[in-house]
Each structure stands twice: as structure tokens, then as C-alpha cells.
Swiss-Prot record:
Protein's name according to its UniProt entry: Nuclear pore complex protein Nup50
Region of interest called Disordered, as start-end residue ranges on this chain: 1-197, 237-279, 339-383, 425-447
Biased composition (Basic residues): 39-48
Topology term for the membrane: Peripheral membrane protein
Region of interest: 9 X 2 AA repeats of F-G: 77-475
Source species of the chain: Drosophila melanogaster
Composition bias type Low complexity, residue spans: 77-92, 110-123, 177-192
One Pfam family of this chain: Ran_BP1
Sequence repeat ranges per the UniProt record: 77-78, 114-115, 164-165, 278-279, 316-317, 356-357, 380-381, 398-399, 474-475
Localization of this protein: Nucleus, Nucleoplasm; Nucleus envelope; Chromosome; Nucleus, Nuclear pore complex
GO molecular function, one term: chromatin DNA binding
Length: 564
């Protein structure tokens, strides 16, 4: 803050009450031209990419150059290098070659006239070429609506077709000649496209007309233009609705003439059973099936053997109506229901690697002599009937009872057993009980220990809480022990209350004499009106609170007994 104005005088404790000299305020004045010439005036300038240097800019201060665009350094908004000269947005219509007419010097007129009349006669103007392809014959009177197609022409002039070929008599005749359903839909699509292109041509004509009129006079009133636009658009919509109605009637006639195809149910093949059925009973063999419901059999490959099955391998709650052949090998996850037919020892499927909740019902007789003991990789809470065989699994099971003689082959057992790696029911050693009790003792907060100051010559003592009235409410002074002790060289009794602290501060210190009011108050309180300590100047209400009402009665009796 180098430019901050400094204090003109020093203000301290010696001259703070002295009057300051009034400060003369100056006035702003305009500097002369000579002073301005000597000053250096700097202006902030924007750095432009590819611009001139700072020296050139300083020299060009007096020149009023055109301001450059902020985005002049950005080439994205620039025009392409080989772009042609900018022209009218509808310049593509200038290259359209109009058909030959009887006179080469005849001017052309748009088919859509927006309320602007011409002074030329009907004999001087032939049929013109329309952008939207509607042939018209010009007349002297202004026409608010576009001229319809006319059969009569002037001077033998033929009506010209549209440059877009939208309204063509040949197309209309060909579309009316078709009667099939496919040709009818194609014709309706063409007619819809014709309607859209007609509306687009109408919009282009309006925009071109508006641009021409705005170029001549920007103050012209355009209300007649939009009125004529509404009329032209309504005519196009009426024509389109007429085409749509005729197309619908032709389609209805074509459909009424089509023969109705009949499908015989008896000739259809029976429906094949699906591979996966969820809660749906299988249909009995030989039942009639819809011809559209035919589905191929599902082929299931397991290893190198391909087996085509007609019954579902995975069935949830469904019951098969006939005995299905048992596959050679079962699935890794066995979720199939047990077939109703009797299973032989040779056809018994192998046990699943992961079996969730399935009970092993195989007996010792059905097992071959050369086969290894069948065990599950992971068995969750299962009980096997083969208790006499050891478990060869790396993980012997979670919550499964041990096998008996083969306990040594177990890797980890999460059961209540005596193995070294037992995580089932871990019993802590007995020696750890003592440290646990010590930790509990350490968690308890330490009690405040203090040495109570005891009055040896006291004839009565009682622990109480002292309240002294200040203004309108009682204030807590503290908890202590009340003592009644005789005064030396006197028959009077001293009432002393010491706080339960190491210092034993005196809370109440007075002599019991006649005239001190004392009474019971509340449930367990004794009220006295006295001077609590010699330091107090005036008497106030003193409230002594004990634990029970009996103790309060006993305390009141002792105090009244020793008042003399």
C-alpha cells in the first residue's frame, strides 16, 4: 500500500484532547495538454495470435483500426479455401432448365401468388412453370388462391410438369391400377411422400417470395402472404385426405377378394419336449399340439459323448409321466429330481462335487470294490451314512461330524474336535481368566480418595448437604459432615459442617442459642434461620438435607436438645 496517505500528525495520550487543525480539501482539476504529453498513458490490450508487436500497436494508437474478432485466431469458424462465392440460399433453382415455350421473351411467374396482382393481360402471359409442378393460366385479376390445373391453354402452350416430378398423371394412373395389398401400401407411401414434397415446395416458395419482398422494401406488410399460405396448405391437405380415402377403399376391396387359408391340426407334427421346464407338467404323449408350437430337441454334450434327451434335465417341481433314461454322467451341480423308476446298481449316477442339502443314500453294498471312497469337496452341515470310511477332502467339512478312524487325513476341521486346527468351539486356557479380570478392574474409573478431617471432641455427627438461600432460591454450598461439639469454658454447643475434602473447608459454623428457628421441611430437610458463618453479615435461611426422613427427625431432635 505504497499509495496510501500517511497520517499528518501523531496522536498519543498527551495530545488526544487537543483540537486538530482543519484540513483543507482540494478540488480536482483537469491537467493541461502539456502535462498530458509528458505523461505515459498505458492501455490494456488483448494479445492476438499472429498480430503485430507492442511497438507497432503503440504507433497505431492514433489510428482508428477496425476491432478484430475475439475468435479470429480460431480457424474452426473460417470458410473453406475453395468455397465458391456466396449466393442466394435458393441458388440451386437457377440452373433448372425450363421446357421450351412458344415465346422466348415471355416472363415466368410462380404458381403460388401471395396477394400481389400484375397489370399484364392474359394474352401476354402464357402458362408458367411452377416450382411445385402446378400448371396455371395467368389472368388480369389478382387471385388469392393458386390456380388449379387447367385443360385449356393460351396460344397452344402446353402445361409444363414440375421440376421435382411430384404431381404426375402417369404416377396417379399407375397407382390406381394396382389392386394387391403390397402395391397398395407402396402407393400410399408414395402419396405421402408427394404430400410432404408439395408442402416443402410451398415453404420454399414462401421463403423465396419473402426474401424478394424484403429486399425491395423491408417495411411491407406480410399479412396477405400468410393468409394465402393457409389457403394453399388447406388445399394440399384436402387432396391428401381424398387420396387416403380412395386408397383405403381399394385396400378393403382387395382384402375381401383374397381367399382364406385353412390350417389342419391333424397334419401338424407333435410338439417335442423342452429341455428346461419350470413348474409346468409335461403334456401326455399323443396329444394334439398347435402347428406353430413345434420346437427342436435340445442336444446336450458332456465331454465327448453326445446324448439327445426328450425329457428335461433340470426340472423344478415337475413330475415326469414316463421313465426317462439315465445319462452316463451326472451334472456338476445335481439339481435334478429323482426318477420314479427303480435305479440299478450299474445305473446309479456318480455323486456331485457340490451337493447342497442332498442326502447320500448309497449303501456299502452298492459300492464297487475298486472305487475310491465318495466324498464331497465342500459339504455344509451334511451327515454321511459312510461313517466307517475316512474323508479324503482337503477341507473336511463345515460342521460335519468326523469320520472315526480316518481323522489323520483331514486338513482343516471346523468342528468341536481335538485336532490342532480346530476353529469350531475354541475354549480359552484357564490361565487367561486372571488377566481378563485385571483388565476389567483397569476399565473402572478410579475413586476420589480423600482424608476426612474428623472432629475428635464431637458428640454427634451426620453426613448432609448444605443449601443457603440467596435472593429467592436455595444455592448448593456443598456436601459435608455435621458435628455437634461443646465449646470450651462454656455450656453452649457449636454446630460445625466440614466439607468432604482433603482440606475440610468449613461450610457452616455457628453457636446453637435460644431464638434460632428450627423446623422440619419437606421430605428429608431441616430448615434453620441463622448466620451460617461469622463472615456473613446477615441472617439467612439454611437448609440441611439428609438421606431419609428418619435421619431428618433425628437431626432436628438433636439440634433442639442442644439449643440453650
Amino acid at each position: 500500500m505504497a499509495g496510501k496517505r500517511q497520517a499528518t500528525s501523531n496522536l498519543n495520550h498527551e495530545n488526544w484532547d487537543l483540537e486538530e487543525e482543519p484540513e483543507e480539501r482540494g478540488t480536482f482539476r483537469t491537467a493541461t495538454e502539456e502535462e498530458l504529453k509528458t505523461r505515459v498513458i498505458k492501455k490494456a490490450r488483448r494479445k492476438i495470435a499472429g498480430g503485430s508487436s507492442a511497438a507497432e500497436e503503440d504507433g497505431a494508437e492514433e489510428k482508428t483500426a477496425e476491432p478484430k474478432s475475439v475468435f479470429s485466431g480460431f480457424s474452426g469458424f473460417g470458410k473453406p479455401a475453395a468455397s465458391p462465392a456466396a449466393g442466394s440460399p435458393f441458388s440451386f433453382l437457377a440452373n433448372v432448365t425450363a421446357p421450351a415455350t412458344t415465346s422466348s421473351s415471355e416472363p415466368k411467374k410462380s404458381a403460388f401468388s401471395f396477394g400481389f396482382s400484375s397489370s399484364s393481360s392474359s394474352a401476354d402471359r402464357p402458362v408458367s412453370t411452377s416450382i411445385c409442378g402446378t400448371a396455371s393460366t395467368s389472368s388480369t385479376a389478382p387471385s388469392p388462391l393458386p390456380a388449379k390445373e387447367s385443360t385449356s391453354t393460351v396460344d397452344g402452350a402446353k402445361p409444363t410438369t414440375s421440376i421435382f416430378g411430384n404431381i404426375s398423371a402417369a404416377k396417379k394412373e399407375s397407382s390406381e391400377a394396382k389392386t394387391s395389398s403390397s402395391s397398395t401400401s407402396l402407393t400410399s407411401t408414395m402419396e405421402t411422400s408427394e404430400y410432404r414434397e408439395s408442402v416443402a415446395d410451398l415453404n420454399r416458395s414462401v421463403i423465396k417470395f419473402l426474401q424478394d419482398q424484403m429486399g425491395k422494401s423491408p417495411y411491407c406488410i406480410l399479412t396477405p402472404v400468410f393468409k394465402n399460405y393457409d389457403e394453399h396448405l388447406k388445399d394440399l391437405q384436402d387432396e391428401e385426405s381424398a387420396r387416403t380415402n380412395s386408397t383405403k377403399s381399394k385396400t378393403a376391396q382387395a382384402r375381401s377378394q383374397e381367399p382364406v387359408a385353412k390350417v389342419s391340426r391333424a397334419s401338424s407334427p407333435p410338439k417335442a419336449a423342452t429341455t428346461f421346464t419350470f413348474g409346468k407338467p409335461s403334456a401326455p404323449i399323443g396329444a394334439s399340439v398347435s402347428p406353430l408350437a413345434k420346437k427342436p430337441n435340445c442336444t446336450i454334450t458332456s465331454g465327448g459323448t453326445t446324448t439327445t434327451t426328450a425329457t428335461p434335465l433340470v426340472s423344478f417341481g415337475s413330475t415326469a409321466s414316463f421313465t426317462a433314461p439315465v445319462p452316463s454322467s451326472s451334472s456338476i451341480f445335481s439339481l435334478t429330481a429323482k426318477p420314479t423308476g427303480e435305479a440299478k446298481s450299474d445305473d446309479t449316477p456318480k455323486s456331485s462335487i457340490f451337493s447342497f442339502g442332498a442326502k447320500d443314500t448309497t449303501t456299502k453294498k452298492d459300492e464297487p470294490n475298486f472305487s475310491a471312497p465318495k466324498t464331497n469337496g465342500f459339504s455344509f452341515g451334511l451327515k454321511s451314512n459312510n461313517d466307517d470310511k475316512p474323508s479324503t477332502s482337503l477341507f473336511a467339512g463345515f460342521g460335519k461330524a468326523p469320520g472315526g478312524a480316518g481323522d489323520g487325513a483331514k486338513g482343516f476341521s471346523f468342528t468341536n474336535s481335538a485336532t490342532p486346527f480346530s476353529l469350531g468351539n475354541i475354549h480359552p486356557p484357564a490361565a487367561a481368566a486372571a488377566p481378563a479380570e485385571e483388565e476389567k478392574e483397569e476399565d473402572t474409573p478410579p475413586k476420589v480418595e480423600f482424608k476426612q478431617v474428623v472432629e475428635d471432641d464431637a458428640i454427634y455427627s451426620k453426613r448432609c448437604k448444605v443449601f443457603i438461600k440467596k435472593d429467592k432460591d436455595f444455592g448448593d454450598r456443598g456436601v459435608g459432615t455435621l458435628y455437634l461439639k461443646p465449646v470450651k469454658d462454656s455450656e453452649k454447643i457449636q454446630l460445625l459442617v466440614r466439607a468432604d475434602t482433603n482440606l475440610g473447608n468449613i461450610l457452616v459454623n455457628l453457636i446453637l442459642s435460644k431464638g434460632i428457628p428450627c423446623q422440619r421441611m419437606g421430605k428429608n430437610n431441616v430448615l434453620m434461620v441463622c448466620v451460617p458463618t461469622p463472615e456473613d453479615s446477615k441472617a439467612t435461611s439454611l437448609l440441611l438435607r439428609v438421606k431419609t426422613g428418619d435421619e431428618a427427625d433425628d437431626l432436628l431432635e438433636k439440634i433442639k436438645e442442644h439449643i440453650k
